[in-house]
Amino acid sequence: MSDPLPLRHIARALVFDPADRLLLIAYEAVRPIDPAKPEERCFWFMPGGGLEEGETHEAACRRELSEEIGVDDAPIGPLVATCNGPFRLFRKPRDARERYFVVRLPSDRIDTARLAETEDNPVLGTRWWTLAELEASAERIEPAGLAAVVRRVLAGDIPPGPVTLSWRDA
């Protein structure tokens, strides 16, 4: 029997620019990949990271945005989704307890100079996605169901409680 994965509480942001595009970060998966599916080497994820001792999800989200995209004092909006369970795409697999908050930026200018040093997986880049691009993409975007949440948020339909999402391989 294998040891249980370490529990990690995580805050992430659905970061939107004024054109309603969503910011995602491309990572290289470090787990073994099926040679017949080289496209699985890359996956896209929202900015964010683990909570530090005594930190709230909102404070962690704000800190991570500063570290990863150079945005200080971002206004953290509503909690719109959660995703819980084993996640194995990062170098350190974890039993993730993720919370996703809406963040609207006044421009699309970000500074990713420190992004690579804050991550344990190779960072391949960042991209602003329109809703149409997100919905049509064949690329691996985590978690499953993210596009539906983005659609609701952009329509002004903030859920009364967080929507439950799941990992693609869960």
Language-model region placement:
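N-terminal strand-loop-strand
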Residues: S2-M46, E58
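A generic structural micro-feature
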Residues: L5-L7, P38-F43, K92-R97, T118-V123
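A structural signal for short, well-ordered beta-strand segments
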Residues: A13, L79, R99-F101
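Short, charged/polar surface micro-motifs in flexible loops or helix N-caps
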Residues: F16-L22, V30-R31, E52, T82-P86, ...
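Residues that scaffold the ATP/ADP-binding catalytic core of kinase and kinase-like folds
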Residues: I25, G54, L134-S137
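Nudix hydrolase/Nudix homology domain
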Residues: C42-W44, S107-A170
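The catalytic Nudix box helix
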Residues: M46-V80
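Active-site-adjacent beta-strand/loop module that shapes the phosphate/pyrophosphate-binding cleft
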Residues: N84-R114, R127, R152
